[in-house]
Amino acid sequence: MSSIKSKTIIEPSENDIEKGEVDFVSSSISNFEEAYEEGPSLKREFKSRHVNMISVAGAIGTGLVIGSGSALLKGGPGSLFIAYLMTGINLYVVLISLGEMAAFSSDDKGFSGFSSRYVDKALGFATGWNYFFKYAIVYPTNLTAVGIVIHYWRPDLNVGIWVAVFLVVILAINLLHVKYFGEVEFWLSAVKILVLVTLIITCIVITSGGTPVHHKIGFHYWRDPGAFAPYLVEGSTGRFLGFWACLVQSCFAYVGSEVVGIAFGEAPNPEKTIRKSSFQSLFRIATFYVIGVFVLGLCVPYDSDILSSNASKGNAAASPFVVAIKLAQIKVMPDVINACLLVFIISSANSDIYIGSRTLYALAKEGYAPKILMLQTKQGIPWVGCLVTSSFGLLAFMNTKSSSATIFGYFSSAVTVFGTINWINILLSYICYHRATIVQQIPTERIPFRSWGQPYIAYASLIFTGLITFFNGYNAFIHGFKYRSFITSYIGIAAYVIMILGWKFTFKAKRVTSSTVDFRK
C-alpha cells in the first residue's frame, strides 16, 4: 500500500539511495464513475480499523530501522533530523492531495485512474506501470532480506531455502479473502508500532543515562563530533552533500506511504474512512519518523566505528538502533530486534504482492494491460495478478550468489526513483483535479474535504519532489563518473518518459483539459 513506505538490504552499491526496505506501499484508487467500470470490481471488505492501522503503520519498514544508519553516517544527526522533517512535510502534502481526490471519487482503478481522468491517458499508462515495476523489483529484495535475517541465527543454511519457503507462504496469504489479509496486516502493523515505540523509548532512556553505564548523553553528540557531517568532500560543500544524502535516504524510507491509497479501494464508506486516515498519516510521520531519527541522533555519534562497520550488513547489526543499544552495553536486544526486523520485512513483502496485483488489476481495468489480469476468485482476489507479481520473486534466487547479487543490488537501487515519480504523478493529478473543480464550478458540498493551502502547497511539494528525483544521482559525478550509479539513479526517469511518449505517439492521446474533465457520478 502508502506506505510503508520501503526500502530491504542486499548488496551495497555505489548508488547513494539506500536499499532499506520498502515496507508497505501502494497504489489503487480512482474513478468512482460507474460508466467507466468494466467487469467485476474489488470487494469492499476491509474494515475501518484495517485501513486506519495501515494508514498509521503501513509504510514503516527497514528503510527507517536500518537505512537511517547509513544516512546518519553520511550526514550527521542534524542533517538526518532536518531531512526527515522536510520529507515528512512533503509527504503529508502528497497524502492529503491523494486523500482529497480519493474522497471525492474512490474506486479501484488505481493511481493510473486519477492520472488518466485528470491529466492524460499517456500519464495514466506510465503511472500504473511505473508503480507496478516498483513493487515487482522490490519484492525479490524483500524475500532476500528475509533469508538474510534468518541467516543471523542459522548461518549453516543457504539463504535460497528461506526465499523458497516465504515465496510460497506470502503468495498463500495474498490468495486469502481480503478481510483475512487485512487481519494479517493489522497485526503485523501492530507489532511494528510496538517495536518502534519500544525503540524510541529505549533511545530516550539511553540518552537520559538510564543504562548500565549510567552516562547521560543529552546533546553531547550534536556538539562532538557535531550535528552535520561532511560527505565525499570536506567543508561546507561536504556538509551540504551529507544533508542531500540524508534527504535522498529519507525519501527511500518514506516511499510507500501512499499504501493507504490501495486500501481506500476496498474500504466501506470511503469518504469518511479516507478523511480520517489521511490525517492519521500526520501522526505517523511526526511520531515514528521525525521523533525516531531525532532520538537516534542523540544516542549514536556519526563517527562511531560500530556504525561504520555495520552499515553494509543486512541483519539487525546494521540497525543504528542496535548500535545505540550496544554503545549503552544493553545485552540480548540485538536478537530481539532481529526477530522484529523479520516481522517488518514479511509485512513489506506481503504488501508488495498485494499492491502489485491490485495495480495490475487497475491497469487492466483502464485498458493498459491484458484483461486476463482482472480475473478474480469468488472472494474477489485478483489471482492472476497475484501470480504474475509473485513470479518476480524468483529473481531473489539471484542473490544467493554474490556475483549476481552485486548486479541485482544496482538494479534494486532504482526503486526510490520509481517511488518519488509516483508522488509526482499524484501531485500532478491533484493540481489538475483542483483546477477542474474551479473551472467547472463544482459545488462545495460535493467536495468531501479540502485541505488548507491548496493548491499552492501541492505546487511546492511538486517542485521539492522533482528536485530530489532529478538530483538523486549526484554522487555519480563526484570523484569521477560512476556509470553504474548513474544508470540506477536515472533508469526510472528514462523508462517513465519513454512510456509516456510511446503511448502518446501510438494512440495520439490528448491532454485532458479542465473544462473536459468528467465529474459525473
Curated annotation (Swiss-Prot):
Q: Where in the cell is it found?
A: Membrane
Task: Give me the Gene Ontology terms describing cellular component.
Answer: membrane
Against InterPro entries, the record matches this protein to: AA-permease/SLC12A_dom (IPR004841), Amino_acid_permease_CS (IPR004840), APC_YAT (IPR050524)
Which PROSITE patterns does its entry note? AMINO_ACID_PERMEASE_1
One GO BP annotation here? amino acid transmembrane transport
For this protein, the record's Gene3D superfamilies field holds: Amino acid/polyamine transporter I
Membrane spanning stretches: 53-73, 78-98, 158-178, 186-206, 282-302, 336-356, 380-400, 407-427, 487-507
Q: What is its main location?
A: membrane
GO terms for MF = amino acid transmembrane transporter activity
Per UniProt, the keywords (alphabetical) are: Amino-acid transport, Membrane, Transmembrane, Transmembrane helix, Transport
Q: How does it sit in the membrane?
A: Multi-pass membrane protein
Disulfide pairs here are: none
Which protein family is named in the record? Belongs to the amino acid-polyamine-organocation (APC) superfamily.
| Listed name of the protein | Uncharacterized amino-acid permease C777.04
Give the organism, scientific name. Answer: Schizosaccharomyces pombe (strain 972 / ATCC 24843) (Fission yeast)
